[in-house]
Amino acid sequence: MTLLPDPQHPLEEAEAEAAFAAILDGAVADEAIARFLVGLSDRGENASEIAGAARAMRARMIPIKAPANAIDVCGTGGDGHHTLNVSTAVSLVVAACGVPVAKHGNRAASSKAGAADTLEALGLNLDRAAETAEETLADLGICFLFAARHHPSMGRIMPIRKALGRRTIFNLMGPLANPANVRRQLVGIARPAYVPIYAEAILRLGTDHSFVISGDEGLDELSLAGGNELAEVRDGEISMRRVTPADAGLPESAVTAIRGGDAAHNARALRALLEGEHGPYRNAVLFNAAAALIIAGEAQDWHEGVEEAAEAIDKGLANALLNCWIAALE
């Protein structure tokens, strides 16, 4: 079995790529993987480690063809807030605005319901979603890239992640290994201090336009509770700024106002949102959708993004898209 480097010492990008290549290829014992992941997490992963690990994951994924302007909206998870599925709802709303969305996601690793769990509860056939991803992306402007299907090397890692029950570098790697090789991303991470580090990892890997976001309370999406850290990665540069709900013309609300439950609960909430229900969940989706629309070049500012997203919901476009998507995969 391959010996992993000491996680207490920072790794260069090539070292990290080699270590995770060994892990993903099954050349490392489970106990050693668990110790390595915990060691990295306790020390704090750096940009070169995140980028190197993502490169190893990319090299082993099953890719799909996608439009050059396709976008992904996802969070790293592991924030412990167990909110409703904001990025999943945002993906539907943004796609309904005409932006191709290659939604990359998985079942829950440390929460009650991940994107895959909730979409399945809504009636989406996950197996068919994986088999027809290119087709549905071309025909409907949205697809779900089920990580379990596109990253077969991750199969033996999931039990380790489940057993650890905590955030690891795999939360950080996932969004950077989208099988559609998207060049535009909205990525939420659970630790505000990590925003510039994660942005540097994205810069190393290459992007056309991406936002890395984190709510001050450690939410892996733009939060309505107050301030948010935002790093914009574009034209080979990183720019940092603060963003609040007021910037988008939205009211503040506590994180607990969008607390989720199991997959069935979250699916009902998402469906109610798309059917026009107002409240904090809708506002959270509008806030994050506005960010995605700015990245996609469909909105010039936060207010315009919120207006476009609200229109996609209120005209029933996002709900109709979900229905068409479910029907197409039956």
UniProtKB/Swiss-Prot annotation:
Binding site for anthranilate 2: R161
Binding site for Mg(2+) 2: D220, E221
UniProt entry tagged with the keyword Disulfide bond: no
Co-factor note (free text): Binds 2 magnesium ions per monomer.
Signal sequence segment: none
Binding residue positions for Mg(2+) 1: S87, E221
Catalytic activity: N-(5-phospho-beta-D-ribosyl)anthranilate + diphosphate = 5-phospho-alpha-D-ribose 1-diphosphate + anthranilate
GO molecular function: anthranilate phosphoribosyltransferase activity; magnesium ion binding
EC number: 2.4.2.18
Positions bound to 5-phospho-alpha-D-ribose 1-diphosphate: 75, 78-79, 83, 85-88, 103-111, 115
Protein's UniProt keywords contain Magnesium: yes
GO annotations of cellular component type: cytosol
The entry's keywords: Amino-acid biosynthesis, Aromatic amino acid biosynthesis, Glycosyltransferase, Magnesium, Metal-binding, Transferase, Tryptophan biosynthesis
GO BP term, example: L-tryptophan biosynthetic process
Pathway(s): Amino-acid biosynthesis; L-tryptophan biosynthesis; L-tryptophan from chorismate: step 2/5
Binding sites annotated in the UniProt record for anthranilate 1: G75, N106
Superkingdom of source: Bacteria
Cysteine disulfide links: none
Names of the cofactor(s): Mg(2+)
Function: Catalyzes the transfer of the phosphoribosyl group of 5-phosphorylribose-1-pyrophosphate (PRPP) to anthranilate to yield N-(5'-phosphoribosyl)-anthranilate (PRA).
NCBIfam families the UniProt entry points to: trpD
Quaternary structure annotation from Swiss-Prot or TrEMBL: Homodimer.
Xref: HAMAP family: TrpD
Protein family (similarity comment): Belongs to the anthranilate phosphoribosyltransferase family.
Protein's recorded name: Anthranilate phosphoribosyltransferase
Organism: Novosphingobium aromaticivorans (strain ATCC 700278 / DSM 12444 / CCUG 56034 / CIP 105152 / NBRC 16084 / F199)
Lineage: Bacteria, Pseudomonadati, Pseudomonadota, Alphaproteobacteria, Sphingomonadales
